[in-house]
């Protein structure tokens, strides 16, 4: 399974609670914090929900 690096680039202030909970589920919470996760369909859906708050990079 492919791995992906997800980095939070924008704050969750003034975001709906659902997006804040999604950021927390992705193990993020601070600007410029990064995590490396397996790119499963579940993670892909979470990233799609908060695409305006995060950036993604594929890891070989």
Curated annotation (Swiss-Prot):
A molecular function (GO) term: structural constituent of ribosome
Annotated Gene Ontology cellular component terms: cytosolic large ribosomal subunit
Database matches in Gene3D superfamilies: Ribosomal protein L30, ferredoxin-like fold domain
Coiled coil stretches, renumbered: none
CDD domains: Ribosomal_L30 (cd01658)
Swiss-Prot/TrEMBL GO biological process terms: translation
Keyword Magnesium recorded: no
Pfam family, one: Ribosomal_L30
Record key words, sorted: Ribonucleoprotein, Ribosomal protein
Family to which the UniProt record says this protein belongs: Belongs to the universal ribosomal protein uL30 family.
Subunit structure and binding partners: Part of the 50S ribosomal subunit.
Protein name: Large ribosomal subunit protein uL30
Encoding gene (name): rpmD
């Amino acid at each position: 399974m492919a791995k992906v690096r997800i980095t939070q680039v924008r704050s969750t202030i003034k975001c709906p609670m659902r997006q804040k909970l999604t950021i927390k589920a992705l193990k993020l919470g601070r600007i410029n914090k990064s995590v490396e996760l397996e790119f499963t369909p579940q993670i892909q859906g979470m990233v799609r929900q908060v695409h305006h708050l995060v950036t993604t990079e594929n890891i070989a």
